Amino acid sequence: LPILDSFEKYPMKSQLDNKEILGLSGNILTEYQDAKHLSDTDVQASGLIKQFIEQYPKEHTMIQKFFNIFCNRELSRLPASRVFKNGLRFKQRQGTFLVAQQNRVLLRLTTPNASMLFFKGRWWETLVAHKVRSWSQKRPNSPEVWQSVLFQTEGNNPRTKNEVDVLLNNQQKLIFIECKSGQVTQNDIYKIDAVRETYGGDI
């Protein structure tokens, strides 16, 4: 920014929000959740899921395989209940999700998002977003934190282009956080590389 009477130049200082930065880069937002609105119920449920996975890894794997293979990772295809070998079973009904074995409760969640958090792995994304939000709230101007950010492809194709798990606007630099709670596959590496190719930056 030049000062006319002295012809001195000073750097301009401005703050752009996430929508402005993404808009300038030509990306179309389809959907996102502001981490400011994360519910305490979902954060607590995510913590319980984490404890369950750490304490009962075999049981979690069995239930998750059923969802991945027989439900094709679609929540709409999940049955109201399912019984596995060794008396393991899960049941979901009206915002309550239950995992039990031999009449012993291993996990009980009470939130409308229970199935999404458990089966889609959103529990880890939620915990990460919660931590980043807590950090942001302690910073000047509270940098924006978004979760589950979806972008649209170019043209008329409504297909989702990319999903960013957690997006942080830190001093005009967008930080993309990929959340993985399990094994990292080659597809995950490709996804991160695609984000770099689309939005720039380093890995």
What is each stretch, according to the model?
Residues P2-I203:
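Intrinsically disordered, low-complexity Ser/Thr/Pro/Gly-rich regulatory segments
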